[in-house]
Each structure stands twice: as C-alpha cells, then as structure tokens.
Amino acid sequence: MVPLLLLLAAPLLAADWTQFRGPNGSGVSDAKGLPDEFGPSKNAIWKTALPPGHSMPVFSETRIFLTAYDADGKLWTICLNREDGKVLWRREAPRPRNQELHKANSPASPSAVTDGRNAYVFFTDFGLLSYGPDGEERWRLPLGPFNNPFGMGASPVLAGDTLLQICDSESGSFFAAFHKDTGKLKWRVERPDVARGFSTPVLYQPNGGELQVIVPGSYRLVSYSVATGERIWWTSGLTWQLKPTPVMDRDRIYVLGWAGGSDTGQQEDIAPFEDVLKTWDANKDGALAKEEIPDPKIVKDWSSVDLDRNGVLGARDWQMFRDRRAAQNGLTAFRLGGKGDMTGKSVAWRYTKSLPNVPSPLLYDGVLYLVKEGGLFTSIDPATGEVLKQARLQGALDQYFASPVAAGGRVYVASQGGHVVVLKAGAQWEVLQVNSFDDEIHSTPVPLGNRLYIRTRSALYAFGTP
C-alpha cells in the first residue's frame, strides 16, 4: 500500500504520464532541462502531422497514445514511436451516432490511459475500447448515447486492474468500473442528482484504508470505493457544472468549479416544485409545460431546465433548477477523508474570484496556480487560499482550455491561440518566455523525461535541448 500512497501524495516521485495530466491528474512531472524557447523552427526534435483532437497524448516507455477525428468524421486512436514520433498504427473506432457538441469541445476530447502496455480510450460517440501495444483490438464496450448537449469530456482512469469511467449527463448519469483486461463490468453506480460534468476523477489512498476514487460533480464531491463502488464520504458545496480536474496534497483536495450564472451574488431562492404547481400547473397533470410558465427567463433557458428533454418540467428538473440557481462558483479546499456526509466539516477555505472555466488548477512546490481566459494568471497559498500574485500573461491575452503543467521549476501554459507561456514557478512567478505557434492549442502540454510535448490542432511536437 505504501508505494501507491506515496505516488498519489507526492507525484514528483512518478516519472510517467499515463493518463490525463499525468500522475493522478496532477500536471506535475520530474522532467528537467527542458528549453524555455521552442517553436516550429526552434528546439524541435521531431514533428508529426496529426488529425485534430483535444485529448492530450499519454505515454508508455516506448509509445505515445492519443485520440483524434478527421474531416470525414472518423474517430481514431493513434500510436506513435516515442523516440522519433513515427506513426506505428492507427485504428478507427465505430461511430454509431454524431452527438451534439459545444463548439469548444471535440469528438476526441477525453484522453487515453495506458497501463504501460495497452491503451484504453473513450469516445462520446461510441464508448470504451482497448488496444494492445501493436494495435490489436482487445475489447470494445458501447456506452451511451449520452444526454449531454456539450458532449463528454472526462477521461478514463486506471486503478490496478480496474478501469474507471465517469459519465455525467443531464439525465442518466453513472459511474462505472470495468476489468481492464476484458471490459467486463465490475460495478456501476447511478448518479440521479447529477447533471452534465466533464471532470476526470482522482485516486485517494488513505493511511490504513481502502483505495478510493474522488469524483467532482454537480453540487457535491463524492469518494467511492474502487473495489465496490460504495460511497464512502461526500460533501456538498460545489457549483452545478464541473469541468476542471481536482488536485491533491497529503491532507486536502482542491476542487475548482465555474459555471455561468453562479458567481457570487447571482444566487436565487427558487420556490419548491409543490408550490409552483399550485399556481402554474393549469391542467393539473403534475408537470409544467412551457405555456404554463409565466417566467420568461425559465422559458428562454428551457434547454437547460428540461433535463430529460421530454417537453415538460417534472420534479427532478425543477429541483435541479433550484439547486443550480443556489449554487456558487469557487475554488474550494476540502480536507480529505471521513465517513458519510462531511458537509460543513471538510471545508478549509474557499476562493470565489477570477475563476477559470475549463483549465484545471495546478499544485506545484507549495503553490496553487490558476489560468483564466484573457490570460489572467493567479498564484494562491494552498494553506490559506490567499492570493499571492495575480497578473495578465502579456503576449498571451487569449482564451485558455489547456491546463497548466509543471516540471523543473517551470510552469507551462498553452492558449487556444497557440501561445505557450513558460513561467518561473513560485509565489511571485515570472514570465520567462512566450512561444508562438501558427495553430490552435486545446491539448495540455506534457513535460516528460528530457522532452516537452506540445499538441496543436494539426501536429504533435517534441521539444528538447540539443
């Protein structure tokens, strides 16, 4: 148990990058000696042209796995040679449907995960597949369709021989565990009180306790047993839509959530369903149709309120609407562990200003970092929630979807417009270099070994010092 505990608590001990944001989703690597200056014509070791996709590459000792989609709408899993970037194989995934997506999402947004040999991928428009190191399909498992108007975003996670996949949607949300060698279901738990979500879970190994997986979702954080799927502890206090992946230290988990309409001061007290039925339910059928609702704001926002898409508002739709209007955005530090409902017992601090929408927080060498659209970069004391420094990343005042990562005393931040900012890490961080690509970047950079990997819309680059 100790090696796993040390891995989860101190990600710098890990030299792998086998899943979204590397060791337990931390975004932290022990890579050293990476160049501050790089670009298409500077310090590029190799470049491989690829079809687009927002997923980040993941790595085994000799291979790189990533997902993509092409102009014909085909879904791909692609394997590269880690040494020279040559394509070793590419496999097409079935696409039985073409789900509605937000313009900021893509059909290949969830990142792959690898056990060091095999690759596991998840696509919104199919479900799960596993491939061997040479591209042979090991198994496939159709999942969905998903009632998520933005498309899915959470990546699969491995815990020993268990493959974990969260599937949060407007209705029918669930969390499931599968055997990584067969795809056979180990357990599945329904999440009826959860709407759409995009956050990738993280693992938690308490001293002397069983391995857990922590899942942020609408309004609450839940820790499940990896072995059984049983809820071990949970706490309320999150916003209604979670996109970033949390980060952890030994004692706390830092959960970021921002959703439109839930900034401080925007909360509303909405009447219970039973009360509005008495005055609005003209035909007395126990549901609310559009024409029965006098509030134009609800009618205008109908697609976000009618979660099950059946044309009327039922008790669940209304309760989720009430919860949504009461929710508040924030970066919250929760104390790890406990049993049962930890609401009101686990919050260490909460920060509610200048919050990113999509990028995950970064915890590196005792400092928390956030990057927000417009290039607003913030360092925070993880002990207190106090802002240490906040300023714009001059030269990269842009939209941000990729998450910050760190290695070798540097923090790397990539903007949608193709700017990659290199910062000197620290409470009073400094911008060292702004590197530019003539291409969009949605994928999170990977600092690994003696290379920095950058995926743009059309290529994967490996940078290093000659």
At which residue positions do the language-model features occur?
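Bacterial N-terminal signal peptides
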Residues: 1-11
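Noncatalytic, solvent-exposed loop/strand surfaces
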Residues: 14-466
